């Protein structure tokens, strides 16, 4: 039955094309078909083959939320996809006005005239009100969840479920092209290699987003950032360099090059909050600008008329700053109106949304994926905390060798919002730079940190230190102890989705000191990596202008700067070593060495780590 109705709809569309029906009439017809077919489409969506109908035609007939892509229905408000059919709405009426009108209407005409004393009375409830104008196009329909998220900041967690990799990949046709969107914030943690079980990485395009957090200028991102990403994907996954892009959807960096490289039926996949929807908004806006650049006599006449009015009225032209601000506001409004919905809440996109960039290229926004464990992180974080954390830190300001740092000393504990607790071993000292969008705090020891975290009511001055609650369901939030593999020099402690903390040991090395220990909530995933700044920006090389090796105390004054190339000869990342059960109370160095030897077949004693063996214990 549903199939026959859709075929009828397709025939109507063909007749409309033959008879040159006006676009507005065609849109109205589609909307009537959407409302009529919505309940049956929702019940029978799995029975339809994606290859039987054009995706754009099917999207026009089967009602979808224009913001998140879920199939719409108007029968059950408690189920996903519920929406209010577009139509005229009445102005808001105060309760006091309603009561006043009721009593005014009950009066006789003479008493009413005496009360009003010649003034015009309020409109009585029985009179017809003027409906509000339709503010959004008829084909832009959003579900209740998206409307509440955008306009009321309401985020029911049960409606922001995060999909698994297998579910997302099975929803994509086998013939589709893939663009894997990777976030620079936690690079390379947002590369989920489970995707490569379904498709070869050589067949994909890799788009690294959010590079405005790493680079101050697009020219630097295009020079150093793109070079590093191309090196990394070639060395790790054998991806051709032309399939790697360094972009920013927020500020429209390098989107034109990406636009020109896209093929038809390209699906944008990636982890949650990797910037897919924001990037597609930028591409949709770019397509709009290219269409406007085409010759159009009617538009040119309208612009000429506006210019003539400005000249005749002698209006002062806008300043350059005002014009830039005005154009940015117009671009932002267009992206929100015509692109997919973008939100800092993970799991916002719930269905595959098509967007036609040109007559020959259609792209799709796809729901983000994540593992079941790491997705639980958002179950106990407040929406405002999630928004602040995903804002990101400017690496070119806070993450370079010239940036300000804090000092973490022996026995002290560093935390960023309770997302982790990093304890410095005895007789050690570290320079710390926080690249997570939340203030850090240093406690004198682990006991004090746990006391404040789990009893915040006793320390009201520190109530804003934590975003992760210390207790859940009247029980302490469990932490898992992890050991950081031995390293020599600086490293980055990277947290999935959130950013990283730069750690640089200082002072003479004590052979009796143990490895770093970090305590994580079970929902938080972390790794260590080589400092990414040495591959994407100019850093100290440790040599003078003549190529002579310098002592470390002379680096800042005499060292030249350089940008290193990633060769793949050394490991770029390493996972942490969990210490659970009996290992939780054992010597950290022994636990680490035993684990490394079990996995790799050999290990280097922590006290013997040097420049030559600094990656020997990385896993």
From Swiss-Prot:
Residues 1-55 form a transit peptide. Its main location: mitochondrion. Gene3D superfamilies: P-loop containing nucleotide triphosphate hydrolases (3.40.50.300). One of its GO terms (cellular component) is mitochondrion. It is found in: Mitochondrion. GO terms for molecular function: GTP binding. Keywords: Mitochondrion, Transit peptide. Residues 162-372 form the CP-type G domain. InterPro entries: G_CP_dom, Mito_lipid_metab_GTPase, P-loop_NTPase. Belongs to the TRAFAC class YlqF/YawG GTPase family. GEP3 subfamily. May be involved in the mitochondrial lipid metabolism. This is Genetic interactor of prohibitins 3, mitochondrial. It comes from Clavispora lusitaniae (strain ATCC 42720).
């Amino acid at each position: 039955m549903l199939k026959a109705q859709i075929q009828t709809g397709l025939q109507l569309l063909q007749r409309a094309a033959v008879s040159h029906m006006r676009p507005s009439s065609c849109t109205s017809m589609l909307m009537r078909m959407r409302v009529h077919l919505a309940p049956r489409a929702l019940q029978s969506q799995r029975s339809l083959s994606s290859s039987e109908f054009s995706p754009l035609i099917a999207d026009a007939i089967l009602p979808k939320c224009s913001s998140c892509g879920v199939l719409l229905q108007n029968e059950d408000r408690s189920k996903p996809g519920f929406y209010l059919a577009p139509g005229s709405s009445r102005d808001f009426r105060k309760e006091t006005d309603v009561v006043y009108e009721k009593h005014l209407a009950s009066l006789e005409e003479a008493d009413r005239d005496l009360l009003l004393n010649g003034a015009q009375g309020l409109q009585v409830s029985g009179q017809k009100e003027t409906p509000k104008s339709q503010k959004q196009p008829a084909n832009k329909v959003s579900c209740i969840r998206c409307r509440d998220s955008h306009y009321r900041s309401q985020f029911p967690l049960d409606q922001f479920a995060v999909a698994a990799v297998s579910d997302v990949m099975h929803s994509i046709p086998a013939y589709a092209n893939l663009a894997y969107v990777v976030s620079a914030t936690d690079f390379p943690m947002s590369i989920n290699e489970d995707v490569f079980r379904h498709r070869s990485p050589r067949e994909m395009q890799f788009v690294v987003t959010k590079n405005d957090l790493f680079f101050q200028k697009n020219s630097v991102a295009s020079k150093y950032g793109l070079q590093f990403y191309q090196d990394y994907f070639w060395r790790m996954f054998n991806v051709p360099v032309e399939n790697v892009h360094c972009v920013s959807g927020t500020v429209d960096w390098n989107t034109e090059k990406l636009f020109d490289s896209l093929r038809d039926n390209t699906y944008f996949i990636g982890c949650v909050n990797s910037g897919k929807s924001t990037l597609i908004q930028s591409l949709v806006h770019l397509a709009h600008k290219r269409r406007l650049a085409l010759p159009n006599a009617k538009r040119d006449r309208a612009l000429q008329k506006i210019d003539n009015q400005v000249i005749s009225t002698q209006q002062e032209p806008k300043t350059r700053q005002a014009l830039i601000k005005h154009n940015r506001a117009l671009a932002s409004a267009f992206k929100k109106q015509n692109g997919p919905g973008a939100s800092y809440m993970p799991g916002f996109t719930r269905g595959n949304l098509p967007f036609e960039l040109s007559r020959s290229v259609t792209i799709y926004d796809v729901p983000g994926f994540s593992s079941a464990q790491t997705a639980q992180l958002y179950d106990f974080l407040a929406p405002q905390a999630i928004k602040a954390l995903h804002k990101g830190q400017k690496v070119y300001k806070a993450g370079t060798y010239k940036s300000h740092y804090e000092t973490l000393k022996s026995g002290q504990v560093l935390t960023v919002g309770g997302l982790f607790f990093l304890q410095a071993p005895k007789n050690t000292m570290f320079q710390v730079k926080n690249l997570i969008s939340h203030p850090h705090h240093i406690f004198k020891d682990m006991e004090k940190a746990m006391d404040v975290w789990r009893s915040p009511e006793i320390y009201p001055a520190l109530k804003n230190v934590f975003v992760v609650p210390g207790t859940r369901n009247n029980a302490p939030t469990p932490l898992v102890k992890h050991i950081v593999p031995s390293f020599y020099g600086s490293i980055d402690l990277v947290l999935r989705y959130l950013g990283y903390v730069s750690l640089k040991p200082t002072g003479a090395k004590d052979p009796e000191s143990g490895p770093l220990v970090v305590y994580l909530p079970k929902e938080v995933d972390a790794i260590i990596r080589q400092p990414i700044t040495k591959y994407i920006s100019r850093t100290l090389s440790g040599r003078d202008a003549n190529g002579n090796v310098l002592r470390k105390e002379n680096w800042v004054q005499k060292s030249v700067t350089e940008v290193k190339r990633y060769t793949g000869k050394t490991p770029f990342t390493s996972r942490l070593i969990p210490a659970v059960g009996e290992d939780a109370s054992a010597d950290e160095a022994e636990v680490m060495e035993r684990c490394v030897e079990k996995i790799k077949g050999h290990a280097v004693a922590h006290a013997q780590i040097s420049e030559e063996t600094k990656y020997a214990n990385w896993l």
